[in-house]
Regions:
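Local sequence-structure signature of Cys/Sec-based thiol-disulfide redox active-site neighborhoods
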Residues: 35-76
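Thioredoxin-like thiol-disulfide oxidoreductase module
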Residues: 66-70, 78-102, 106-108
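Transition segment at domain starts
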Residues: 25-38
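Positively charged n-region of N-terminal signal peptides that target proteins for export
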Residues: 1-4
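Boundary at the C-terminal end of the N-terminal hydrophobic targeting segment
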Residues: 18-20
């Protein structure tokens, strides 16, 4: 029983270890995957149509979504950092927008 409990704890902890490996001491996400042509086109479309991603550098789901886009496409996105201690933090904007969870996507009105 003790061995089973240890295995379960290791399995539960592993995803957070993997996700945290993409975080650096500079308080920003580090996207490492390569983008596809389609993901770059999608990111440009989202940017051009006023879609904004509210994110936090420590958020595992934010990282997972960013990795799906890849590093080239990620640079095209409109991303607002909501964590107070994040690089280029816009915490007050996140508070004003009533962002409660991460990631949150919003289509800005023109």
């Amino acid at each position: 029983m003790k061995r089973l409990l240890i295995q379960l704890l290791v399995m539960l902890a592993l995803p957070s270890v993997v996700n945290s490996s993409h975080l650096n001491n500079q308080r920003e996400l580090t996207v490492t995957s390569e983008s596809t042509k389609e993901s770059i086109e999608l990111a440009k479309y989202l940017k051009d149509t006023g879609v904004v991603k509210y994110s936090a550098y420590w958020c595992p789901n934010c990282l997972n979504q960013s990795e799906l886009f890849g590093k080239q496409a990620y640079r095209e996105l409109n991303v607002v950092e909501c964590a107070r201690d994040g690089i280029n933090s816009q915490t007050q904007l996140c508070i004003d927008k009533k962002i409660k969870g991460f990631p949150t996507w919003e289509k800005m009105e023109n």
